[in-house]
Regions:
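Alpha-helical transmembrane segments and membrane-interface helix-loop junctions
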Residues: 1-160
Length: 160
């Protein structure tokens, strides 16, 4: 279990840093686009598409890191009223639902990437499939982090 905790902590740290870099790049790209449009009346055509890819990356990588830290939104007021065994099984159901969501996300993005891999984003000259890479990476990480949480639940260890 220590190996899994260590691996997931490193992956979460890595993906959070990647999200931070994407967020900083997003800010720079948007500022560049605004300055070019309004100060020089010469809007670069690629800014919107780069910004879209960066927004997707920030959201997906941030979500994966949030799942690792158990920082996702939880409405647990009613769950806290349950006995310990009921709380345990509610947590298990949450992890199962999270894994299911991530698996569907991964499957859907893989399908969309495969069906759009020959299409090109005109202003960037890259495949449309690249739009689906960050959600696929996030899907794999969310599954890994949720499995780690479930293992911790069943072995009575607090996830790191």
């Amino acid at each position: 279990m220590n190996f899994i905790n260590s691996l997931s902590a490193h992956l979460s740290d890595w993906v959070l840093r990647l999200a931070s870099v994407c967020l900083a790049a997003l800010g720079l790209v948007v500022i560049y686009g605004v300055v070019m449009r309004y100060a020089f009346n010469d809007a670069p055509p690629y800014v919107e598409q780069v910004a879209l890819l960066l927004v997707i990356s920030v959201a997906m990588f941030g979500a994966a890191s949030g799942v690792h830290d158990a920082g996702h939104i939880g409405l647990d007021s009613a769950v806290k009223l349950l006995p310990a065994k009921g709380q345990f099984w509610c947590l298990v159901v949450v992890e199962i639902l999270t894994i299911t969501f991530a698996a569907v996300l991964l499957y859907g993005c893989e399908h969309m990437a495969a069906s759009t891999r020959h299409d090109t984003i005109p202003t960037l000259g890259i495949s449309e499939a690249w739009r689906y890479v960050p959600p696929m990476i996030a899907g794999v990480l969310i599954i890994l982090f949720s499995v780690k949480h479930m293992l911790a639940l069943f072995t009575k260890k607090t996830p790191a």
